[in-house]
């Protein structure tokens, strides 16, 4: 897991972990995990935090080691990277920069990516993903469409 980070990042994570691990027992609690993550500019929701804990606390003792913490940070970082990539893809399709993707923009963007798509297929895709019925895809609608397509 450590290979997901640079030595400098690992050192930063370790320093943050040690600051919270006041008794130096090598473990932090869920509450302390929240503090560490907030100190590093992360603000996970309660459900996300619970899932992270379930992923690493296999014995159910509520303790998180530094290795567990690195795993959690790697998961969190990869989710952020995926979000950043999705934003970039959205911007590529949103050619006029209005925050919405039209049927024409979707079709042109897909053709630019080497995908053969007809105007009718682009229209169908927008209609299927267009939750508010305005004929355009917002970032939220586009994200849902892309996530559904990946499964």
Curated annotation (Swiss-Prot):
It comes from the Eukaryota. Keywords: Calcium, Metal-binding, Repeat. Induction: By touch and during darkness conditions. One of its GO terms (biological process) is response to abscisic acid. Residues 8-43, 44-79, 81-116, 117-151 form the EF-hand domain. CDD domains: EFh (cd00051). One of its GO terms (molecular function) is calcium ion binding. This is Calmodulin-like protein 9.
């Amino acid at each position: 897991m450590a290979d997901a980070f640079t030595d400098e990042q690992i050192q930063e994570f370790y320093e943050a972990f040690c600051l919270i691990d006041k008794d130096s027992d090598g473990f932090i609690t869920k509450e302390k995990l929240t503090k560490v993550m907030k100190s590093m500019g992360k603000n996970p929701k309660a459900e996300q935090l619970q899932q992270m804990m379930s992923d690493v606390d296999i014995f159910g003792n509520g303790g998180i080691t530094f290795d567990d913490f690195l795993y959690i940070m790697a998961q969190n970082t990869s989710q952020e990277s995926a979000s950043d990539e999705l934003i970039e893809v959205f911007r590529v399709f949103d050619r006029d920069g209005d925050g919405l993707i039209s049927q024409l923009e979707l079709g042109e963007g897909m053709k630019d990516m080497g995908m053969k798509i007809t105007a009718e297929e682009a229209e169908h895709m927008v209609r299927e993903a267009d939750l508010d019925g305005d004929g355009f895809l917002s970032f939220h609608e586009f994200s849902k469409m892309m996530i559904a397509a990946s499964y």
